[in-house]
Regions:
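An active-site-proximal structural segment forming one wall of the substrate-binding cleft
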Residues: 4-10, 51-65, 69-70, 79-88, ...
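N-terminal structural segment of carbohydrate-active enzymes
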Residues: 1-64, 72
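Active-site-proximal helices and loops of the catalytic beta/alpha 8
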Residues: 55, 59, 122-123, 129, ...
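Active-site cleft segment of glycoside hydrolase catalytic domains centered on the general acid/base Glu
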Residues: 86-118, 140-157
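Solvent-exposed loop/turn segments at secondary-structure junctions
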Residues: 21-24, 71-76, 142-143, 171-174
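Hydrophobic faces of well-ordered beta-strands that scaffold small-molecule active sites
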Residues: 15-17, 65-67, 136, 166-168
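Aromatic- and acidic-residue-enriched segments that line the glycan-binding/catalytic groove
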Residues: 26-37, 71-99, 180-184
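The substrate-binding groove and active-site-proximal loops of carbohydrate-active enzymes
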Residues: 1, 34-48, 102-117, 134-143
Length: 184
């Protein structure tokens, strides 16, 4: 928070924080995109109160804050692993990594599972409700079904209204129809 004035002086209107969630260690390659717990901070980034203070001070200075969101996969030691059907499985029933991506450090989520979808949406709501962030930059948005994004964005707007800012990493222009403000 000590450098927010300097950041603001650069013309910054939005702070985008890369994944700051607790990282997994099983099969890990030190990637912040290997999320162990969507509702816990990586201890190296401070406390929940630290993040709340950062967001509040950024808002006071007229800046919005978005978090990077990793909705396609989790770490192999995420507590969700207790629910095997929340993950994509091969023909033998083994949980798999996202196909064709070379990401062996993460497990692919199964968006056909309504309970997993509900848990994902609950985790997204958490940061908006508890920390008052302004939205998300969604990693590999094309790897998540369009109907999930439509539902999630609509529900998040019930909390944030039109102030919600949603960015999609991808190139499919259909992501705009899902409610994303920017696709890149």
């Amino acid at each position: 928070t000590t450098r927010l004035d300097e950041i603001k002086s650069l013309g910054t209107t939005v702070l985008w924080l890369m994944p700051i969630y607790e990282q997994g260690v099983e099969n890990a390659v030190s990637s912040p995109y290997c999320v162990k717990d969507y509702k816990k901070l990586n201890a190296g980034y401070g406390t929940l109160d630290d993040v709340k203070t950062l967001v509040a001070r950024a808002h006071e200075k007229g800046m919005r804050v978005i978090f990077d969101w990793v909705a396609n996969h989790t770490s192999w030691d995420n507590a969700w692993m207790q629910n095997k059907t929340w993950y994509t499985q091969d023909a033998n029933g083994n949980i798999i990594s996202p196909e064709g991506m070379g990401w062996a450090d993460v497990a692919d989520l199964n968006y056909d599972n309504v309970d997993m979808r509900a848990a994902m949406l609950e985790a997204m709501k958490y940061w908006i409700e508890v920390v008052d962030i302004d939205g998300y930059r969604c990693d590999y948005a094309e790897g998540v079904p369009h109907d999930f994004w439509q539902q999630a964005i609509n529900e998040l707007k019930t909390i944030k209204g039109d102030e919600l800012l949603m960015l999609a990493e991808g190139s499919e222009t259909t992501l705009f129809a899902d409610g994303f403000d920017l696709v890149y």
